[in-house]
Amino acid sequence: MALETLNSPTATTTARPLLRYREEMEPENLEQWAKRKRTKRQRFDHGHQNQETNKNLPSEEEYLALCLLMLARGSAVQSPPLPPLPSRASPSDHRDYKCTVCGKSFSSYQALGGHKTSHRKPTNTSITSGNQELSNNSHSNSGSVVINVTVNTGNGVSQSGKIHTCSICFKSFASGQALGGHKRCHYDGGNNGNGNGSSSNSVELVAGSDVSDVDNERWSEESAIGGHRGFDLNLPADQVSVTTS
């Protein structure tokens, strides 16, 4: 197809004027290019530029002088102070438990309870007559009276002791054995107001009563029965002559 178009008469007629135009224009272009002058391009010399810039830079002395002038003219700009941070109270400083007596505050209820114990007054600091409790626990058949005495001392220690008192002569002994040995003196003599071999008497002491009142009652009973005995067991017995008929 391409060969046919080239060989056809229409294609040859259109291609001839184009070729002629090109042939006519080529010598003109060549002449114009020949008449023109070449333009010179600017060449940059980096070394020369560096020298010029170095000349423009100030020396060290000038630079220091400029710095001093700038510092003298300028004003110091102070940044505003930062607001203080809110102080956070530590758990140990947070004290809600307060003593009602001295006003001290504590961080825990346990610490407050331990502190309150120091305000408590010790009990039983003095001996009073009302603190002495006398109780009659037991009465022996031989007529002895056993009394338990509890005394509250200042140290809070109760001292309990037993008083063994003879029901006939009202002598007191530290032990029941000593009282029993003493009672034999009364029994061997046979001077018993009741006529029996033994007497059973009991004395009740109430707290707050006086022992002298009980003694007076006992002596009044003895005088009503047969009067006071005319001998003392602590003295040797008198020699008695016995006549037999």
Curated annotation (Swiss-Prot):
- Provide ranges: composition bias, Polar residues: 1-15, 123-134
**First and last residues of each zinc finger (C2H2-type):** 97-119, 164-186
Q: Where in the cell is it found?
A: Nucleus
Keyword check for Metal-binding, yes or no: yes
Q: What are the record keywords, sorted?
A: Abscisic acid signaling pathway, DNA-binding, Metal-binding, Nucleus, Repeat, Repressor, Transcription, Transcription regulation, Zinc, Zinc-finger
* GO CC annotation terms, alphabetical: nucleus
Q: Which domain of life is it from?
A: Eukaryota
Cystine crosslinks:
none
Q: InterPro entries given for it?
A: AZF1/2/3-like, Znf_C2H2_sf, Znf_C2H2_type
What processes does the entry annotate via GO biological process terms? abscisic acid-activated signaling pathway; hyperosmotic salinity response; negative regulation of DNA-templated transcription; response to cold
Which GO molecular-function terms appear in the entry? DNA binding; DNA-binding transcription factor activity; sequence-specific DNA binding; zinc ion binding
Q: Where is this region: Disordered?
A: 1-57, 112-141, 193-231
What does the record say about induction?
A: By abscisic acid (ABA), ethylene, dehydration, salt and cold.
Q: In which tissues is it expressed?
A: Highly expressed in roots and at lower levels in leaves and stems.
Q: What Gene3D superfamilies does this protein's entry cite?
A: Classic Zinc Finger
Where is it mainly found? nucleus
Question: Short name of one Pfam family for this protein?
Answer: zf-C2H2_6
Which residues, by range, are in coiled-coil regions?
none
In its keyword annotation, does this UniProt entry include Ribosomal protein?
no
Q: What is the protein's known function?
A: Transcriptional repressor involved in the inhibition of plant growth under abiotic stress conditions. Can repress the expression of various genes, including osmotic stress and abscisic acid-repressive genes and auxin-inducible genes, by binding to their promoter regions in a DNA sequence-specific manner.
Further comment: Plants overexpressing AZF1 have increased sensitivity to salt stress and barely survive under high salt conditions.
The record ties this protein, via PANTHER family, to: C2H2 TYPE ZINC FINGER TRANSCRIPTION FACTOR FAMILY-RELATED (PTHR45988), ZINC FINGER PROTEIN AZF1 (PTHR45988:SF42)
Q: Give the protein name, as stated in the record.
A: Zinc finger protein AZF1
Q: What is the lineage of its organism?
A: Eukaryota, Viridiplantae, Streptophyta, Embryophyta, Tracheophyta
